[in-house]
Swiss-Prot record:
It comes from Aquifex aeolicus (strain VF5). This is Phenylalanine--tRNA ligase beta subunit. NCBIfam families: pheT_bact (TIGR00472). Its main location: cytoplasm. Mg(2+) binds at residues 448, 454, 457-458. The lineage of its organism: Bacteria, Pseudomonadati, Aquificota, Aquificia, Aquificales. PANTHER family: PHENYLALANINE--TRNA LIGASE BETA SUBUNIT, PHENYLALANYL-TRNA SYNTHETASE BETA CHAIN AND LEUCINE-RICH REPEAT-CONTAINING PROTEIN 47. Belongs to the phenylalanyl-tRNA synthetase beta subunit family. Type 1 subfamily. Residues 394-470 form the B5 domain. GO terms for molecular function: ATP binding; magnesium ion binding; phenylalanine-tRNA ligase activity; tRNA binding. It is found in: Cytoplasm. The gene is pheT. InterPro entries: aa-tRNA-synth_II/BPL/LPL, B3/B4_tRNA-bd, DNA-bd_dom_put_sf, Fdx_antiC-bd, Fdx_antiC-bd_sf, NA-bd_OB-fold, Phe-tRNA-ligase_IIc_bsu, Phe-tRNA-ligase_IIc_bsu_bact.
Amino acid sequence: MKVPYSWLSEFVELSDVSPEEIAEKLSLRSVEATVETFGIDLDGVVFGKVVEVKEHPTKKKLAVVKVQVQEHIFIDVVTVDKSVREGDGVIVALPNAKVGNMCVTEREFDGVVSKGLLLSAQELGLEEKSEGVLKIHEDFKPGTDANEILGFGEKIIEIDITPNRGDMLSVRGVARDLSAIFRLPKKKPEEPTYEETGEFFIEIEDEDCKRYRGVVIEGVEIKESPLYIKKRLWQCGIKSINNVVDITNYVMLRDGQPLHAFDLSKVEGGIIVRSAKKGEKIITLDGEERELDEDILVIADREKPLAVAGVIGGLESGIKENTKDILLESAYFNPFRVRKASKKLGIQTESSYRFERNVDIERVDRAQDYAVYLILKHAGGKVKVVKDVYREKYKPKKVFLPQGKYIRYAGESYKNEEVKEILDALEIPNEIMRCGVEVLVPSHRSFDIQRDVDLIEEIMRVKGYEHYTSETLKLPSIANLWKDNLLEVKKYLRDKGLTEVINFSFEDSKLYELLNLPLPELEVINPLNPTQRYMRNTLITSLLRTAVYNDRNYNYDQAVFELGKVFFKEGEENRLGILLKGNKPRTLKEEKWEPYDLTEIIAGIFALFGLEPEFRNAKRNFLHPYVQGEVYLEGEFVGFFGKLHPKIAKELELKGEPFVAEIEIERVLSKKRLPHYREVAKFPPVVRDIALVMDKELDVNKLLIDTKSQIGELLEEVRVFDVYTGEKVGEGKKSVAVRLVLRSKTGSLKDEEANELVNKLVNYLKEKYGVELRT
């Protein structure tokens, strides 16, 4: 948003503050801001008065205009704009003038020498596209520098508004923040008011419109706007249309309240604010026909939609040259509803941009009254009706900030007078109490001030974070800190062929419902996207969303991990999420990921920190009933893993078999053991792979525990590397392939000794669990 320095000066005393200081302080304490200079380079460009217009003697499409450019100096200028009339004020580039990157010279048009150029708004850089010469209706002395007339050279503050600061989307809002930051007195421009009068039908059918105020003005004259309004619009990057439309835009920029004017003759029987009907169509002001549905809020009459509420007006009911009577609208629409309509229709306007960030419901009438005043002043007419339908009056929320909590966050107590001065400048009603401060959240800050910590932020940012003392963070002197540990985990996973992904922490409810998981406890009040308003409580949904996206882009082989935060009412924690799908990377032949690749990776991560996980059976609805497990560490649950349930994979249209895991990495790292020396083995290992057929329901973890106890110290490693179920092993059975790594510390194990140990183990398992050695 662009805000002229001179316009700010109408609301706050800025005589001792430069534009550069404003931008610097805003960037540090409010929103990012920069300074730019308005206008292109002009030299030798002046105001001229047309004294005579003649047709070109040979070229009928041209006119020869005599222009007074000094008290006694007149020049002839040839132009294609035949709308120029005697008495018009124009902007003239004299011979050798500079207009931006263009240099103007005398030029002959079939025997007539043009000693200058009449400039359009487009040539002056005021509008992207314009037709005809720019006409100035105000009376200036011929020869007046065009820079002075057009305001070129004025400093403009350009600010980048964050989604929660809709109150800053106006000159008034920026001035309010500046008043607080610089401790400057505000100015109070006069604000005319118009009481309710007359009768006009207005009905609000949809609860997403809390307030609708309409003013009928009869007998207006549609014409060009006065220069001061045009200049403000140009400085803010908005094209001038006509006096009525320009005034609605002018007031929107000034007060932050979008307005819309309807041609009253096109309104049949009053105004109804309702949801659009499916298949209903409207031709909008940009000339496009758009199909609507029930998600879109419209302003309609008894016959048809007239406008998309908060987004864009309809072409048929728009203001035209022959419009005589108008209905001026000022309203409050639900930000989420406006955002949904804007996204569905693919339109973002200055109006929707503000409604999406919440407008001040209590300023609906005051902003409109100022627009009415300007319309009567510059377009004439008479107010016939003022009708205000305010369904749900704004009730300010009470927020109490205890002094003690402020101290915990800021590191110091506040001075009552200073806090009161800041809150008063921000126009936040407050009462200083013995142990804190209580405020009533004003309507212009209802979107972002919800809790005591929001007040702490307001006080600290306005005061300036540089005024708070800081101390060097003292960390315990230990060998491996949290960050180093995470880097070690990331390196291990990358070495295994996995790629790190970083997902948004915001989720919608669809995946949670599909996975039959409880919805997250935390819901964002002001989400960037209305469909993603939950703060995730698991990484699995984020990873599945990534998998779906990659599949749709024909990337079916995936091995990814995410180290990210999940959120709960009690706080947030870091977790590790893993997703494997399709073929493994970096292999000479196609080799698919298997479930026990997950357990191997998990065990490898634990081994980095001197830990050993315990795997147990699990029953999670979104995982395959026979291919899943839980991870325990020293008897505590720290994660789960498994194959995504085939029905869910099919619903998500995922190709291949997705395997997922989630580890509570903070809890794992909290149990990290210091590394200790282990002597390099002197003797070679003996590896034996055996396949055991057993009941499908048998817990494999029990077999692994018994294997360790039976073989004892000679067993260096035991792990499952494959599971098979099918007709070759019989119904209700499964074949589990186990790898045994045997090693002696005193000498090389002979094959006979290794075979004897394996046979003894198989016989023991057969007797205890009824397993058979698969041949």
